[in-house]
Amino acid sequence: MSNQEYTFQTEINQLLDLMIHSMYSNKEIFLRELISNASDALDKLNYLMLTDEKLKGLKITPSIHLSFDSQKKTLTIKDNGIGMDKNDLIEHLGTIAKSGTKSFLSALSGDKKKDSALIGQFGVGFYSAFMVAGKIVVQTKKVTSEQAYAWVSDGKGKFEINECIKDEQGTEITLFLKDEDANFASRWEIDSIVKKYSEHIPFPIFLTYTDTKMEGEGDHKKEVKEEKCEQINQASALWKMNKSELKDKDYKEFYKSFAHDNSEPLSYIHNKVEGSLEYTTLFYIPSVAPFDMFRVDYKSGVKLYVKRVFITDDDKELLPSYLRFIKGVIDSEDLPLNVSREILQQNKILANIRSASVKKILGEIEKLSKDNENYHKFYEPFGKVLKEGLYGDFENKEKLLELLRFYSKDKEKLISLKEYKENLKENQKSIYYLLGENLDLLKASPILEKYAQKGYDVLLLSDEIDAFVMPSVNEYDKMPFRDASHSESLKELGLEEINDEVKNQFKDLIKAFEENLKDEIKGVELSSHLTSAVALIGDEQNAMMANLMRQMGQNMPESKKTLELNPNHAILQKLLKCEDKEQMSAFIWLLYDGAKLLEKGALKDAKSFNERLNSVLLKAL
């Protein structure tokens, strides 16, 4: 059959160009990526052999074999895992799922060391081989298929797929190394890389090499070559080993291989439980957020094993979604080996493991929180996700509230709720918060003025998730939460009502505001909670809905709002005496525009605002 030629997805061409010309400061990681892929293929075959009736009689010894030819400058990585068919080759080696490449390319910083750390996270580990290889040949046969296929590419925009002969299922990747990277076709180089990155891959890795030794004596000495095959890794599932046998370095190197992440984890939790339930967990808190953390189709970072046999790496129920940044392993002794996805979702054993695991992880995060500098490294990438737990995890809500940090009116740095309570003023009855689109607008909000007079601090919440979760949080340490913009909260400040005399005094001015702004607002009210601000756009009824829609990525339909005026402000006192209708109209619009700026940070009609401002300035000069 003739070769079929295909073109790489556009983003892959960009990626390959990046890999080949400018990417890695540590090229050796390509081998870690290929070995990790081989291990995944073996895991998947093991699972199929448990669940697919047709494969239950299949007998294999799962392993990974490495070999090289220093003369021909080739390096081969071979596994007897699940293998691929033609469609798999096109999908996995011609495109990148989940738009990973686009996210990858946009995340690059230009710093080679930082950029190289991103490579495995974005599911592009295979392509890293083009950093050292001028050509790659992949021969593969899927376990459920009779036909084998070869994939060939030089990484320059195209690849070929053709039928080939291969007896055993699995995948064999041959790299034709570039001259400057021929050192990777070396026994000691390969051995060193495997021990560094893949020591605890749970399958044996064998290296085939030619050993040369001298035999005979004197003039009869001669060089004898012997081909040898040695296992070069421990092939022990690290999580099943005793903690006393492991060093910090062991955990960190395993993480890099397991999570495809060059950066070191912030922390790890290794736990073995014996008794009515027997299971082992090893969880890592990364230092870098997964690229797909805020995508609906995010990939779970936790693998489930039963008695060291891989079951799934795609079950989002293993941990709650607000802990989706966690990487690691759950290995149960009690679950049945042929457990199905449906059984997993309703399994009491797994529910107990999940509940205990969440408590362990939150306990570890609490330890990190004792050191502000360390906690900042955690909270900056993961704080927003952690907040999601307030909405669904009622069992751990109190613990989560302790772990959250907030900006506030009075503090420049993030504070805990405990710190907020420690600074409460006498007679303060609630924890006040204000929701908005960004921190700068919140800090400038006129709503804060009366709270400042009372000395009350206000939490400033600008994350999209805040509007979604705050209504579900009633109190912290027996103190209620209150939205600072709500009338209930303002009543707690003990503000005086606007008396009838003042209302009567401003009656005509309010009418003038309503006439000029009839297409913009639903009404005008005098407010007693403004101090230095002249006006404020208030919308207590719709504010929460607008924030919720923003959190869901939708825009709230434009609705008319109430304009609140400060009757004590000097500008309004002077406007009471203004008899020039045209000038008054310009002033009214400028005050409204100013209130809009404080609310939104921008104006819909900047041109008209500029014209009005120029007109007022001209008359004033």
UniProtKB/Swiss-Prot annotation:
One Gene Ontology CC term in the entry: cytoplasm
Domain of life: Bacteria
Coarse class of the protein's main subcellular location: cytoplasm
PROSITE patterns tied to this protein: HSP90
GO-annotated molecular function: ATP binding; ATP hydrolysis activity; ATP-dependent protein folding chaperone; unfolded protein binding
Keyword Ligase: no
Stated role: Molecular chaperone. Has ATPase activity.
Protein name according to UniProt: Chaperone protein HtpG
Organism: Helicobacter acinonychis (strain Sheeba)
Lineage: Bacteria, Pseudomonadati, Campylobacterota, Epsilonproteobacteria, Campylobacterales
